[in-house]
Amino acid sequence: MMSYLKQPPYGMNGLGLAGPAMDLLHPSVGYPATPRKQRRERTTFTRSQLDVLEALFAKTRYPDIFMREEVALKINLPESRVQVWFKNRRAKCRQQQQSGSGTKSRPAKKKSSPVRESSGSESSGQFTPPAVSSSASSSSSASSSSANPAAAAAAGLGGNPVAAASSLSTPAASSIWSPASISPGSAPASVSVPEPLAAPSNTSCMQRSVAAGAATAAASYPMSYGQGGSYGQGYPTPSSSYFGGVDCSSYLAPMHSHHHPHQLSPMAPSSMAGHHHHHPHAHHPLSQSSGHHHHHHHHHHQGYGGSGLAFNSADCLDYKEPGAAAASSAWKLNFNSPDCLDYKDQASWRFQVL
């Protein structure tokens, strides 16, 4: 502000010029008549108009264009006003129902919000695995932040959160991180291997949410993966990738998660691979080859950079033949969801996702 004030001469003059010039232009554009086009006058309905509108509303809450036009002619208002009136009237109805029914819808909303929070948390690294994770929330729980991956890892790689992740792609990823989440996730992922296998568990969860899976895979890195896998967010892939890169290395060793590796190196490129990988993991858990899972984890973890990459790809591929394609898909994030589904135990995947 100060600097502007100090240069009134220049600034002001410039502005002054601009102002008048603009004014001059606007008139030709009809400026005077409509000084502010953005705001329309508030439409006031007469009682008779309201009666007509309410009568139609009683008949149908969603009148089609023909009905709206007919009413618009009757009451002398543009059809767009009629449309807006119905939109507002429906909103009013919903509000009344809500307050009447004692905020039934709110709880649901709240749930989702935790999920969202999860996302946040994952970013923040808070390790908040929302209980939400159980259902869609499962991913939310996964949401326990991936940031906390280390903790999660310590926790035993609460990979299960992955499942949650699947649900909430991003958050899920986060959740994935949280061991707590894991439980929920893992439960859903029937594969919830023992916690030690949490990673696998994750996997299984992952499987379910491949993306989540990815997350799981990322298990430690669920977050990133989850995001990627979940891709639900859309930015997940990159996310994972960055996540992977970043967190992976740190958590990786400790986590031992195969995910890390995926996350890490493969993340971006391998993101898909990672995803695939996840899938496979999921498989393992499914098969309950926790040992297997673990192996994978270690494997990744050790070679997580190069090996992981190869692994990812390979594994992914293995697990889901279409892996290659999937991989690229995964890459896209898309792949996560669809591919994962396809490749993965679809059933579990789907289940998770749904």
UniProtKB/Swiss-Prot annotation:
Known function: Probably plays a role in the development of the brain and the sense organs. Can bind to the BCD target sequence (BTS): 5'-TCTAATCCC-3'.
Cross-link (Glycyl lysine isopeptide (Lys-Gly) (interchain with G-Cter in SUMO2)): 344
UniProt region (Disordered), positions on chain: 91-146, 257-305
InterPro entries, per database record: HD, Homeobox_CS, Homeodomain-like_sf, Otx1_TF, Otx_TF, Otx_TF_C
Lineage start: Eukaryota, Metazoa, Chordata, Craniata, Vertebrata
Biased composition (Polar residues): 94-104
Gene: OTX1
Alphabetized GO MF terms: DNA-binding transcription activator activity, RNA polymerase II-specific; DNA-binding transcription factor activity, RNA polymerase II-specific; RNA polymerase II cis-regulatory region sequence-specific DNA binding; sequence-specific double-stranded DNA binding
DNA-binding region: 38-97
Chain intervals with Low complexity compositional bias: 117-146
Entry keyword set: Developmental protein, DNA-binding, Homeobox, Isopeptide bond, Nucleus, Ubl conjugation
One BP annotation, GO: regulation of transcription by RNA polymerase II
Organism: Homo sapiens
Stored Pfam families: Homeodomain, TF_Otx
The keyword Nucleus is annotated on this UniProt entry: yes
Cellular component GO terms held in the UniProt record: chromatin; nucleus
Superkingdom: Eukaryota
Keyword DNA-binding: yes
Protein's UniProt name: Homeobox protein OTX1
Family listed: Belongs to the paired homeobox family. Bicoid subfamily.
SUPFAM superfamilies in UniProt: Homeodomain-like
Basic residues bias (residue ranges): 274-284, 291-302
Tissue specificity statement from the Swiss-Prot or TrEMBL entry: Expressed in brain. Detected in the anterior part of the neural fetal retina (at protein level).
